[in-house]
Amino acid sequence: MKTLSTQRLLRGMLPVAMLMLMGAWQAPALAASCTQGSTCVTVDGSNSGAMSTEAARQSKQQFNDTKSLRNKVNTRVEKEFDKVDKAIDSEERCDDSLNVNAYWEPNTRKCLDRQTGRQINP
C-alpha cells in the first residue's frame, strides 16, 4: 500500500518538476540582452549594427578564402588522380602490346623498347 501511494506521488510530481526545470533553464536565456560577445538573433533586422555587419563580412571573407583553398586542393588531387589513372592505362596497354620488345618502366611510367630504350606507343 505504501509503494502504491509513493508511485502516485511521483507520477503527479514528475510533470511539475519537469515544467519547473524547463522554466529555470529558459529564464537566463530570456533575460540576456544583446551585448558584445553574445550571440543575438534578430527577426526583423532592426538591430543591425556596425559590429554585426563587420562580423558578417569577416565570416563571408573567411568562407571565401577556405572555399578557394578547398578548390585548389581538390584540383591538385584530381590532377594527381588523372596522372596515376593515365599511367595505369598506359601500363596495361604496354603489357598487352604485341610488341615483344616493349616493357613498362615504373620509375618513369613509360613504355620503352628493350633494344633501343626509346619510348614507344603500343
From Swiss-Prot:
Family: Belongs to the UPF0482 family.
The entry's keywords: Signal
Position of the signal peptide: 1-31
Lineage: Bacteria, Pseudomonadati, Pseudomonadota, Gammaproteobacteria, Enterobacterales
Residue span of region Disordered: 46-71
HAMAP family: UPF0482
Domain of life: Bacteria
Name of the protein described by the UniProt record: UPF0482 protein Spro_2288
